[in-house]
Amino acid sequence: MHIQHATISADLENCYDSVAHAVAALGMRSFGVRATAIAVFLSCYQTMRFYLKTAYGVAKEPYGSTAETPFSSLLQGSGLAPWTFLCVSTLMINSYKEQGHGAEYLSPITLQTIKLAAAMFVDDTDHFFSGERGMTDEDFLDMVQQGINDWAKTVISTGGNIKIAKSHAKVSVPKWDRGQSRSKSIKHLPVRSFTIPQRDGAIKSVKILSYSTAMKSLGVKFAGDGENPKDHILW
């Protein structure tokens, strides 16, 4: 590719356990779920009581919550949790895309332009960015940083947070060398890291990596340059 491009892998921290119920209700309503059904679902979540079972037997006293101090989780293992999070994450992606973020791809056959903002698999999200002809490296990296900020704010507004330990950034900025397009070394970029706002108000950073660097994703280590790295076998 002869233009700048980047992929930001942002992992959501405890995604099912962090969704605010008000946002969950809005997400389900946007998919046509009746308000009465939503009230039943969420009230069950909020007031459930649990009996712990261990090797010593079942606890005599349950623990749980009340209407005054409700739980706010979607509950890991609940059959409704994946569908509810689908509703919420769809709103999140649509909101993010409405802000203008995403990479544009041109079909060489139909000449149709496709804009792809992100690809999401439950709590693992890859965000895509592409530059424009004539765009400076500084402007492109600023655009990526703004996209990260907007996504982080979107996540926080739903009750969630981005987990830094499982997130990373990959950037490719082209340069011409004897008529060949090659990627600049990361050390020659104007910045070498991006910042990610956190739910508690802190600002954390992630290093910028090249697409040839293999990173763990969905339990597999792979690079983003199309090569077949040995990292996963060694790992």
Name every feature range the model reports, one short phrase each.
Residues 198-235:
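Basic, alpha-helical interaction scaffolds
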Residues 48, 52, 56, 161-213:
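Short, conserved micro-motifs composed of acidic
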Residues 12-32, 69-72, 114-156, 174-185, ...:
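Catalytic palm subdomain of template-directed nucleic-acid polymerases
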